[in-house]
From Swiss-Prot:
HAMAP family linked to this entry: SecB
InterPro entries hit by this protein: SecB (IPR003708), SecB-like_sf (IPR035958)
Protein's UniProt name: Protein-export protein SecB
Location(s), subcellular: Cytoplasm
Cytoplasm among keywords: yes
Main location: cytoplasm
GO terms for MF: unfolded protein binding
Keywords: Chaperone, Cytoplasm, Protein transport, Translocation, Transport
Assembly description: Homotetramer, a dimer of dimers. One homotetramer interacts with 1 SecA dimer.
Gene: secB
Length: 167
């Protein structure tokens, strides 16, 4: 297997939202229930060449790590129970070199395992800071095993048809 070279050329917050709808009326002393949803998207950037074109051996991709966190509490005074909702789309611009030598599966693994693994600590820090600024303890998300997530999504997509996004 050829060694793939994946480089990051930039990273940034594409979207960030924090909702604290029941403040200052939230009085629950219990820890909220935390629901985390993760979605990964990869988009080939315009102006980069396809794998089949021989004069180009690398391609550029924007990888988006979309994380949505919803914290709920059981509090009679709060009708919907929402403590907060935090959502971020954290992106990186990556290039993959040696493209002609890589299989399609190796490229997908770089995009949906390597890219998100690099981006996650930065997105995690942003979520911790935003929840802290919202008046809650900093939310430190547990590490995510993107390889296992990739494998699980691959199994689901084989039965449902293919897609370039992973949830």
């Amino acid at each position: 297997m050829p060694q793939q070279k994946m480089r990051i050329h930039g990273q940034y917050v594409k979207d960030l939202s924090f909702e604290n709808p029941n403040s200052p009326f939230l009085s629950s002393s219990k820890a909220p229930d935390i629901n985390v949803m993760v979605n990964i998207n990869s988009a080939k950037l315009e102006g980069t060449k396809n794998k089949e074109e021989v004069n180009e051996e690398k391609s550029f991709h924007e990888i988006t790590l979309h994380i949505e966190v919803k914290a709920t509490v059981k509090d009679e005074g709060i009708k919907d129970g929402v403590a907060f909702i935090c959502e971020t789309k954290y992106c990186g611009i990556f290039s993959i070199e040696n493209l002609k030598e890589l299989s399609e599966e190796e490229v997908r693994q770089a995009l949906f395992i390597g890219g998100p693994t690099f981006l996650f600590p930065f997105a995690r820090e942003i979520i911790a800071r935003v929840t802290s600024s919202g008046g809650f303890p900093p939310l430190m998300l547990d590490p995510i095993d993107f390889e296992t997530m990739y494998e699980q999504q691959g199994q689901q997509q084989k039965s449902n048809g293919s897609n370039s996004n992973f949830n």
